[in-house]
């Protein structure tokens, strides 16, 4: 079983993956870690500032095949990052798709208006990262794009509009329940 967690920067993808690790005892792969490993090892000329499209083209094929391998091996894995393409399902056969749960974390525009300072203040709740200089307008645009893409494609999104910790706890519980109710993959 594989859980894919997508969303724009600062929505708490790594935080949710860490909560799922603690709750389900499932390992997770941060696509940011994969990105930095490939960059620092010299396996790509891309940089952390490269366009998301270029980074997705590099990272997603690797993550996709890791997801397939986990499913084939009957293993559980959470993959989180902003480099999961919206049309990821097209790259998996139906029997694999049945073993994938996807959720895109999205802040509502009103939430960002009310809590932008808190969002930035909590950017290091799981990992210590350098201040990214987050722009509120750009973050609102990113979240609106994610919401629209999920709605158009019929993909699951989780709209964060109220107390953050309670929302993430509820989503974590929902995902835990869903994954326990599903069966194992039989190739």
Summary of predicted features, one role per range:
Residues 54-99, 103-107:
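Glycine-rich phosphate-binding loop used to anchor ATP phosphates in small-molecule kinases
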Residues 18-64:
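Conserved substrate/cofactor phosphate-moiety recognition/catalytic segment
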Residues 11:
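ATP-binding Walker
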Residues 8:
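P-loop (Walker A) phosphate-binding loop of NTP-binding proteins
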Residues 144-187:
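NTP-dependent small-molecule kinase module
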Residues 14:
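Walker A/P-loop
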């Amino acid at each position: 079983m594989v859980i894919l967690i997508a969303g724009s920067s600062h929505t708490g993808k790594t935080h949710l993956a860490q909560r799922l690790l603690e709750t389900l005892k499932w390992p997770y792969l941060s696509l940011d870690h994969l990105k930095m490993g490939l960059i620092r090892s010299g396996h790509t000329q891309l940089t952390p500032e490269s366009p998301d499209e270029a980074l997705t083209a590099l990272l997603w094929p690797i993550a996709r095949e890791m997801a397939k391998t986990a499913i084939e091996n009957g293993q559980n894995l959470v993959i989180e990052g902003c480099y999961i393409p919206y049309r990821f399902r097209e790259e998996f056969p139906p029997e694999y798709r049945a073993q994938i749960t996807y959720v895109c974390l999205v802040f509502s525009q009103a939430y960002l208006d009310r809590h932008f300072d808190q969002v930035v203040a909590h950017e290091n709740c799981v990992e210590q990262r350098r201040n990214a200089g987050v722009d509120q307008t750009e973050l609102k645009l990113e979240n609106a794009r994610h919401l629209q893409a999920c709605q158009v494609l019929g993909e699951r999104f989780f709209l964060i509009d109220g107390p953050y910790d309670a929302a993430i706890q509820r989503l974590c519980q929902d995902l835990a329940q869903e994954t326990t109710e599903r069966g194992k993959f039989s190739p």
